[in-house]
């Protein structure tokens, strides 16, 4: 009957709402704080075109909306551009999750590998837990000081009575 030793380590989980830089997250350009020798350790879960996601999510609703319009000036030709230029909505949102800091959870340590596993598990269930946040870009970075996860998503709602019946919304 072997005894098990239980070790309890306290760490903070930080969740930040970011501006979102898909090009940085997918490493289309490399920031100064990136260690290029560790980039191969990153996990790119998905990296879809946001415009393609908009077509998939909203084209049917856009057609229904436009078909009902009697005035040509009320029709929307490009829903993505309409939202991109809107003052009320953003085309997408980003959250960044990190456990601990560069001292307690360095990417190059055992604790960093633990953070990687925890963040990976968190991502694996994210879309199922959040069906109205359509993830189009998600990346786990192991090439910076601390492992962290970027999740970029388009929030949407269905069943709206005004405007498009399926539309961008973080509020609903």
Question: What annotation goes with each model-predicted range?
Answer:
Residues 1-172:
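N-terminal nicking endonuclease/strand-transfer module with a His-rich metal-binding environment
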């Amino acid at each position: 009957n072997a005894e098990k030793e239980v070790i309890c380590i306290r760490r903070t989980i930080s969740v930040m709402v970011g501006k979102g830089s898909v090009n940085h997250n997918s490493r289309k350009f490399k920031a100064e704080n990136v260690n290029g020798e560790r980039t191969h350790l990153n996990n790119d879960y998905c990296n879809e075109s946001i415009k393609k996601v908009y077509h998939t999510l909203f084209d049917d609703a856009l057609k229904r909306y436009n078909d009902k319009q009697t005035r040509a000036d009320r029709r929307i030709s490009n829903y993505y551009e309409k939202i991109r230029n809107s003052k009320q909505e953003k085309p997408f949102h980003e959250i960044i999750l990190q456990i601990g800091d560069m001292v307690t959870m360095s990417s190059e340590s055992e604790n960093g590998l633990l953070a990687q596993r925890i963040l990976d598990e968190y991502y694996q269930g994210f879309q199922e837990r959040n069906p109205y946040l359509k993830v189009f870009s998600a990346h786990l970075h192991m090439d910076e000081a601390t492992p962290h996860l970027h999740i970029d998503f388009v929030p949407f709602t269905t069943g709206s009575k005004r405007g498009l019946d399926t539309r961008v919304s973080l509020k609903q």
